[in-house]
Amino acid sequence: ISLGLVGSEMCIRDRDIIQGTCFRDPISIIAGDYEDARDSDIVIITSGIARKPGQTRLELTQTNVNILKSITPEIVKAAPNALYLIVSNPVDIMTYVFTKISGLPENQILGSGTILDSARLRCGLSEHFQIAQSNIHAYVFGEHGDTSFIPWSGAYISGVSVDEYYDLEKKLGKDIEPIDKEAMLQYVQKSGGEIISKKGATFYAVSSSVCKLCSLLVSSSESISTVSTMMHGEYGIDDVCLSTLTLVGPNGVQGKVPMRMTKAEIEQLKKLSLIHISEPTRPRLIS
């Protein structure tokens, strides 16, 4: 693993990671430059300033876009065949900009998108229903941020819709309240900001989600995940990066997986997709 860190002071900062490698499988960690990433299989881009308490992801936009523009030519030159995983916030805009300026095929580019948001949703539903997260299939679509939304028509617990599962639990004599869907959405959207306000940053859940995505990209089989990719007419949305169900694997992005949603949900997704990266702002972002 080559950490994209430039400067001698970064060698000290990554020492904390290096000294923990004895407890894991053999791995090499270095603080290097672009040349050290030559011919990489996967490049993870996390460059940019971090969110401060009370700050939204979108407020990071111009600064982080400028940083991304400055590093893209060099990293793409060093690793033109790599799969690129964009994690920097605001991740959907960053994925859009990288897709537009890198010149790489779109199957090589994906953003971490709402994979963490979907995990937070599963966590919230697990806590509410007192059921293992592995039994829950529910997803967050759209932007990784305050305009994400939950297509509840596609939320299931072991093949049973969330609404029907509540009725089932009541019949079994469980003491359980109806799920407050708006409160659950707020739980998903605000979790990151609340954690940042208490400890300064999010580390563990986001790093776990990135590791999971990397495992999908090196797996011998394909998997479906809510990653951010360029939309080409799916659900009536075009020329914007956001998260829907996407088939990913060792060859990167294989395509979108259409999920049956209600007309109201599709219209909501279309409406929200225009908020975080409106058409008038797109040329300015990539110029």
PLM feature spans:
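Short, small-residue-biased leader/transition segments that mark boundaries at the very start
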Residues: 1-12, 276-283, 287
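Conserved N-terminal Rossmann-fold NAD(P) cofactor-binding segment
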Residues: 8-40
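N-terminal Rossmann-like NAD(P) cofactor-binding module of classical short-chain dehydrogenase/reductase
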Residues: 44
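Conserved NAD(P)H cofactor-binding loop of Rossmann-fold oxidoreductase domains
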Residues: 47-49
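Glycine/Thr-rich phosphate-binding loops of Rossmann-like dinucleotide-binding domains
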Residues: 53, 94-95, 286-287
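Short acidic, glycine/proline-rich loop/turn micro-motifs
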Residues: 54-58, 258-259
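Rossmann-like NAD(P)(H) cofactor-binding subdomain of soluble oxidoreductases
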Residues: 56-123
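C-terminal substrate-binding/catalytic lobe of Rossmann-fold NAD(P)-dependent dehydrogenases
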Residues: 102-108, 118-263, 267-274, 278, ...
